[in-house]
């Protein structure tokens, strides 16, 4: 058998195998994995036996790719097995564990991750917990004995938007839950030293030195990777200006720390040339660079992104440390394979793709022999090229790209990297002495002022928020190939033709609707409600999902991506049925992200610039009729009972959205507008509360389907069993977003189509599966 000689193609083959797992709805069975492993072994033996050749080289690549697939699938199966046993969901469980990472504190709760050390039953090694209404302030490394109520990681599933279940799997979170009560500590549960305790102390010192605000939050992110104070509005600002990569500690900052470490040792050798006789300078500088990067990465919390950066730096320095000449692509694939061997599920995170994608582009553009170029070209072209190169990745993960990013980063990258970050590193060195570090923190804050003004200006530019649908796999691959062609070296034939491969990115995933048709979507927003209605040329949103006490909401995380996914850049009309946080929580962030033609609300003055939602209003869009059935102008605002009730009727059917009205208003609607209530689809009132969706109302509406918008295992037990029984007696099919994810239904001229459930249509192997309750 021939000796194995490393080639960059081997690394790409292994990466391709691990990434092949991502689009699968189910993991391969154990038997299938065994067969694939055997095939890979046979292929490897055949490839590296006898004389070499192109066919055997290709066979070797196939074997390596299969090994990558089998390895990633085995780790994925193990991660899934480490999730909470379903039988323990909703039960009180006693456990002990260490606080891991930086706790997030707000007025109502403390949220943190816990590494378990003991428990009455077999439990996940890592879980995410909330502690409500507590005066306790746990610190990193504290060991706590607790009684907790847990559930398996379960997020919202829509056609686009944030995927918590993917994030939980990538972070090895096996359960989420809340703390019922704390128990007295025991001797086997002792606090441990944790670097996060140091980070928390530094964050406290920054709090004392600087006033609250975005600049202080940015300094924490840059200095110690602490993004707890950065709210959704700030993240939106950073995304719109294309500067997200600068805010939390990134590969760029760790790389700068490595460069400073190597540079300081170079200075030492310059001052004492005789050191080179004992230890060669290149190797010493490489070791110093790596050690400095390690220290900085640890201060940043040693998160997965910083771990990837350290591995990449080590791979890039491998040639120096081993005194071997290694090409850029060899070093790149060494880093790629090392990262994937350490964590084959790293491709679940956007950071993996963005960091390796950016480095690949830089090698493609500048890895060949360097040629002198004008300064403007040497600085501007990489920024423009990087924006184009990362466009498919940005759309795949965020459905958004900032066309202002190249301009902003031309100024922001050198300003932050070479001015702000070195000052922050100095402040970190001086942090044990508050009287010395405080002025340095304040200096950095003052210098961040121009950067903050720049991103605010950039975020207001017309093309700063360019949203597009999340690309299909085919469109994504075509775009990557097109970009490789477009950014090929000078002299490559027909480089401009690569732009045509980007055109599929512009295509909406949802088909155009004919006159008289409409699409009804009940988005998965947890314990809240948001209903999207789309006609041939118009879009209506009824309610904006829940907001949270810490200031976050689902406008950014769910609604904006869902609208971008169907190619909607703005809303023609927004109706906020009433002022409760679970229906109106996402309004502010949605107004910040999208243009909205008109806003209606039932609560006077609740939304600036909104019109009052009033009974009797009718309008027609593209052959589809809309009508407000409640509230009348004579009714004072009564909270739930003043909810806007919206009826939609098209050529293929009709739907009713009653908000949170109860049986009293239902009875009034039956008496006064009974002839308008007969519809095909009813969104259950008040999420399935026992005080709504009465038997009389169901008899008047006669729905074929009833949809519930509710949170998974919600504390209200919505939909209540009595409501489910009423709907069953009425003969309607029942669908619940808590079980099925977002629900989509087309009303076409030929009739009402079969509903589509996101937890089935968008299923990936890390998603929890659920059977439709009450569905045929």
Locate each region found by the language model.
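Transmembrane helix-bundle segments that form internal channels/tunnels in multi-pass membrane proteins
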Residues: 1-84, 88-95, 184, 265-280, ...
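Cap/insert and terminal regions of metallo-dependent hydrolase folds
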Residues: 666-742
